[in-house]
Structure formats: C-alpha cells, structure tokens
Amino acid sequence: MKKILTLCVALLIAVTTISAKEYKHSLGMVAGLGIGAQYKVMVTDNFTIFEEFGYLGGCLADQTGALPANGAVNNLVRAYQANAAEGQGIKLDWYVGGQLKIGYLQGGAGIIGVGAVGGIEANMTNAPIAFSFDFRPGYGCVLADTGVGGVGAGHAFDFSFNLGVRYTF
C-alpha cells in the first residue's frame, strides 16, 4: 500500500510539473461519427500527422439514400498547424489538411475515401493535455455489396464533427 501511495504521489508531481507548451507526440481518444484511438506527431513546427483507428458508427449518404456504416476505420490525417492565440494557461492552434480513410463496414464491405480536415486545438500550458475540435467532410467508395436492404456498392459522402482529448509528451 505504501508503494502504491508513493507511486501515485510521484505521478501527480510529474504531471503537474510537466509543461505542455511544445510537444512532439500525443496519444488519446477522438469521438465524432465513431470513436477511436488517436496518435499525433508534430513532424515540424507547422506539419502534423494524425493516425487514428477506431469504430465507425452512423450512416454515409449516397445516391440511393443511406448506407449503414458500422465497422472499423483507419484514418491517416496530414495537416498544417499554426498558432492562433496564447494566454491564461491555454495555447490555441488551428489546423487544416487532408485525410485518407480505409476500413470495413458491417457485412464485410470495404470502404476507402479521402476528405478534408479543419479544426482548432487547445493545449494546456500547465498540464500535458490537449483538446481538439474539428470538422471532416469526405468522399468515399464502398468496395463491395453491403448485403443490407439490397443496397449495392457505390460512392458516399460523409462528414463528422469530432472532439478529441490527448496526453502530450
């Protein structure tokens, strides 16, 4: 019990003394049309790459109506990021870029798509935490018959608003 208490106190001290002004890596969760894990790396001061893997839920709108979109998806996002404002313990950055989406839907159908990404990120300057909010419109192709309601393969437009929280290091 004493070792656990000592470890907890040490972690608390480490977390409260780490400054998150500038970070290279971050790891956390993102939620929007689906939910998943997100890893972000700052390649340069203004270029960032997000890698996301998670569960996709909801619908994709296509020319025949709506395709069920329950499945797994892997997003690779490349974005330009720049400082918007700083003060009161928060550093705001905005970012804009593109994404490549690869995954599968219920019934075994595959999906591949491209899209745009635009958002804002708030970095806590006194704690190693970052929050993000973004909008992601996209276009994708369903690669096989979904087997649901007779809807076959086709193209689909989708969009999502996403909220993320990450530990920065």
What are these regions (language model features)?
Residues 133-135:
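Internal, hydrophobic beta-strand segments that form the core of beta-sheet-rich folds
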Residues 74, 156-169:
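Outer-membrane beta-barrel "beta-signal"
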Residues 41-131:
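Gram-negative (and chloroplast) outer-membrane scaffold detector with strong preference
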Residues 113, 148-156:
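Flexible, surface-exposed loop regions and adjacent strand-edge segments
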Residues 22-38:
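Short N-terminal segments immediately surrounding and downstream of signal-peptide cleavage
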Residues 24, 61-63, 147-151:
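Extracellular loop and loop/strand-boundary signature of outer-membrane beta-barrel proteins
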